[in-house]
């Protein structure tokens, strides 16, 4: 499952950068605080991203991602993806997840 997590983290960071290239800016929801990414699309009747203070990356769909990847252990009904995103002090994007056996899965770009 960690291989799948690594692939998902790469998909997210690639989509964010493609969005930034096309729009000359990062999605505004990304802050300097590492925050869990919202599982967009699992519930369209209530904006649970803001209720649960999760990062809403719906601006990436459908042009950059068909849907936001979620951890393989997460259910479709979970509000969060178990993947986290933030800008570091140098302005780079960090996308990370928690792997099995305590492994940290992270890409900084």
Residue ranges and their predicted role:
Residues 1-7:
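Amphipathic alpha-helical segments typified by the pilin-like N-terminal helix
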Residues 25-29, 47, 56, 108:
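Short, solvent-exposed coil/turn linker segments
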Residues 7-34, 40, 66-71:
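Alpha-helix exit/C-cap motif
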Residues 66-109:
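Short, surface-exposed interaction loops/tails
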Residues 34-70, 74:
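Acidic, glycine-rich loop-and-strand cores that form catalytic or ligand-binding grooves
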Residues 9-12, 16, 57-60, 64-68, ...:
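Generic hydrophobic secondary-structure signal
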């Amino acid at each position: 499952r960690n291989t799948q997590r690594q692939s998902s983290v790469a998909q997210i960071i690639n989509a964010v950068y493609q969005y930034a290239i096309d729009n000359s800016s990062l999605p505004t929801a990304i802050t300097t605080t590492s925050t869990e990414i919202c599982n967009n699309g699992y519930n369209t009747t209530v904006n649970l991203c803001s209720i649960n203070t999760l990062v809403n990356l719906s601006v990436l769909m459908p042009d950059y991602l068909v849907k936001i990847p979620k951890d393989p252990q997460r259910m479709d009904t979970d509000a969060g993806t178990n993947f986290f995103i933030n800008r570091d002090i140098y302005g780079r994007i960090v996308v990370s997840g928690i792997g099995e056996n305590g492994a940290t899965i992270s890409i900084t770009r």
